Amino acid sequence: MKIYTQRLDEIASDQTFETLELTFDTRQKSRFRATLTNGTDIGADLPRTGILRSGSFIATNEGDILRIDAKPEQLMQVTAKTDFELLKAAYHLGNRHVPLMLTPYALYFEPDHVLAEMVEGLGLQVKQVEHAFEPESGAYAQHNHDHRLSPIKSLHHVH
């Protein structure tokens, strides 16, 4: 079984690769198993550096490359008659800290009948659909600078 252990920021334009569709739940994990469309089983043991976004590339130590795509999955789609109503729904869903995908004309979240009823109570339309899920990463998402303490120069000489 091939084990993918590296995340790649980019690949050469002439590089060949296979593709694999994964749900959002799987793309959040650093370790998983999956089956390619040709029936080959693979494993992933990746650095814990955040979610695999659709279009991300991972590689084995031997140089095999795999592009990860978002797999369509069951989601709740919220639509509204006005932009303001949609904005209001996004506010209320955001207050519940659920993964939420925003588009200009709809909001998407993982199936949850309590949240669906809340949004319907605000006067919006909710229906279950199959759609790829790429929720917003949020203000506190993983980013690339170091938060370790840096040495502080002493203002006073200490004995």
Curated annotation (Swiss-Prot):
Keywords: Chaperone, Cytoplasm, Nickel, Nickel insertion. InterPro entries: UreE, UreE_C_dom, UreE_N, UreE_N_sf. GO terms for molecular function: nickel cation binding; unfolded protein binding. Its main location: cytoplasm. The keyword GTP-binding does not apply. Gene3D superfamilies: Urease metallochaperone UreE, N-terminal domain, UreE, C-terminal domain. Coiled coil: none annotated. GO terms for cellular component: cytoplasm. GO terms for biological process: protein folding; protein-containing complex assembly; urea metabolic process. It is found in: Cytoplasm. SMART domains: UreE_N. Transmembrane segments: none annotated. Involved in urease metallocenter assembly. Binds nickel. Probably functions as a nickel donor during metallocenter assembly. Belongs to the UreE family. This is Urease accessory protein UreE.
